[in-house]
Amino acid sequence: MSFIVVMAELAPKEGAEDKITPLAEALVEETLKEEGNIDYKFLKSVKDGTFMFVEQWESVEALSKHMASPHFQLFSKESADLAEGMGIKVLGAEEVNLYE
């Protein structure tokens, strides 16, 4: 099975971590309901406090719909002034079964 993997890294401005977290939690809650979403996680680095979204999508079309969704647009707008920057990697992937 092939799918799309997204790794989006967000560096919060100093003091903004507590403001970004509830915004991200709301985004995750709504995104997990989307058609075409396989998985969507919000993580925080124990090393430097950077946030990361790790996402799996059935298709590029599903990812595109997500990026146009009201909850994604709201998160993007509300978090823009709270972040130093954001880096995104989008990969085509295929599941590998290591135990066959």
Predicted feature locations:
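Glycine-rich beta-strand-turn "strand-cap" elements at beta-sheet edges
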Residues: 2, 43-47, 77-100
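Short, well-ordered beta-strand segments in beta-rich or mixed alpha/beta enzyme
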Residues: 4-11, 41-67
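Short flexible/disordered coil segments
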Residues: 8, 70-73, 96-100
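Short, surface-exposed ligand-recognition loops at beta-strand->loop->(often short) alpha-helix junctions
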Residues: 11-17
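An amphipathic, aromatic/His-enriched active-site/gating alpha helix that lines ligand/cofactor pockets
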Residues: 26, 30-38, 56-90
